[in-house]
């Protein structure tokens, strides 16, 4: 939703079309709390990325795919669900791009391929995933890389964001807030655990900068988190300060 709004506000030209392919349609309850928002000028198509992608589509030389599909909340799903969605999804998205000659893909991966650690990670750090989510995301990255390697004019950006927070996110940050608000949050051990994160509007603005404002060829990987990263205590204290929550 944030990405579509930004594209509509700043990038859309005459005759451009936006397709939102999703398993959940506007007006329906999504995989996170709340009803999916419908926006004017967007063509919504119900689609399961785990299956072959087929719909009435006329390609242009300016087409861009933003592949955001994933099973990502962890823990919370059976192990096979991560592999089924993240790997089959990557195969079907790249097959669709190949079929229609689309040369630009942005794929949202995760910092999970690095594995659980608190040392600073760079894009050159060797991935060592230790969860089904991280393993499946790294595999999906490689599937996209194979697609790019088949034609050196293709453009692939792989983004590895940390915790994404903001309106409509309903993930870790939202649960942390409500845990404090309802008085059932407590530190289970350390207060200095690092929580690498990024604001959703900053993330989609980077998507636009990378894929729409610039042209490049090849493959690039970008970690997307604020630096320096915040600790869980810093995040909790900031939430308390701006919302007036009092802990007793």
Q: How would you name each of these model-derived features?
A:
Residues 92-132, 152, 157:
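Conserved Rossmann-fold NAD(P)-dependent oxidoreductase catalytic core, especially the SDR/UDP-sugar
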Residues 210-248:
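Mid/C-terminal beta-alpha module of Rossmann-like enzyme folds, strongest
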């Amino acid at each position: 939703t944030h990405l579509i709004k930004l594209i509509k506000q700043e990038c859309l030209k005459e005759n451009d079309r936006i397709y939102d392919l999703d398993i959940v349609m506007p007006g329906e309850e999504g995989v996170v709390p709340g009803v999916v928002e419908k926006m004017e000028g967007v063509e919504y198509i119900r689609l399961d990325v785990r299956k072959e992608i087929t719909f009435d589509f006329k390609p242009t030389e300016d087409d861009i795919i933003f592949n955001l599909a994933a099973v990502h909340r962890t823990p919370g799903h059976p192990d096979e669900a991560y592999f089924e969605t993240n790997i089959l999804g990557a195969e079907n998205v790249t097959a669709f791009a190949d079929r229609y000659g689309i040369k630009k893909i942005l794929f949202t991966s995760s910092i999970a391929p690095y594995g659980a650690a608190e040392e600073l990670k760079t894009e050159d750090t060797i991935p060592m995933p230790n969860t089904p989510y991280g393993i499946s995301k790294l595999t999906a990255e490689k599937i996209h890389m194979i697609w790019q390697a088949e034609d050196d004019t293709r453009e692939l950006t792989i983004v590895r964001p940390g915790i994404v927070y903001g309106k409509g996110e309903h993930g870790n940050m939202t649960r942390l807030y409500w845990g404090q608000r309802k008085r059932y949050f407590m530190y289970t051990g350390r207060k200095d655990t690092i929580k690498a994160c990024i604001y959703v509007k900053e993330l989609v603005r980077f998507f636009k900068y990378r894929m729409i404002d610039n042209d490049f060829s090849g493959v690039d990987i970008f970690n997307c988190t604020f630096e320096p990263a915040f600790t869980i205590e810093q995040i909790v204290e900031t939430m308390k300060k701006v919302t007036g929550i009092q802990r007793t």
